[in-house]
A protein has these predicted regions:
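Conserved N-terminal beta1-alpha1 strand-loop-helix module at the mouth
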Residues: 1-88, 92-96, 102-111, 124-131
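Histidine/lysine/aspartate-rich catalytic loop segments that bind and position anionic ligands
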Residues: 114-139
């Protein structure tokens, strides 16, 4: 039988009570999913790198970072240098997808690739051997 893992997002957490929020999620989850948005690639802003590091370092669970940012080539490597366990970048935001994925993996992290709803799945086929996960957005 397959094992499924739960990756809840903490996007709606009360950040004034972050340690308690993370502990509450940790009681029933396998990972924490951290959505990082820059208000350029997507029309919302969540966390910058410094705040993300605080969240990552406060967690007893592995952190799965999903970067919805421009310049994902640079950001992917920056986030892979944190204590996050995995980093997912958007195909549409990378200038050199293969190099970025390899850089993430070279830093010992799981590498993921996300695509927007309008991007054909065939766009990521050349990179499947470098991927630990794929995220297909629905919004």
């Amino acid at each position: 039988m397959r094992t499924f893992r739960i990756f809840p997002s903490i996007l709606n957490a009360n950040f004034e009570k972050l340690p308690e929020e993370i502990a509450r999620v940790a009681a029933t989850a396998d990972y924490i999913h951290l959505d990082v948005m820059d208000n350029i690639f997507v029309p919302n802003f969540t966390f910058d790198l410094a705040r993300s590091k605080e969240i990552i370092d406060a967690s007893s669970l592995p952190i799965d970072v999903h970067l919805m940012v421009v310049n994902a080539d640079v950001a992917g490597i920056e986030y892979a240098q944190t204590n996050a366990s995995s980093v997912t970048v958007h195909f549409e935001a990378c200038e050199n997808v293969s190099r970025t994925l390899q850089g993430i993996r070279d830093l010992g992290k799981r590498a993921g690739l996300a695509i927007k709803p309008g991007t054909p799945i065939s766009a990521i086929e050349p990179f499947l051997a470098q991927l630990d996960m794929v995220l297909v957005m629905t919004v």
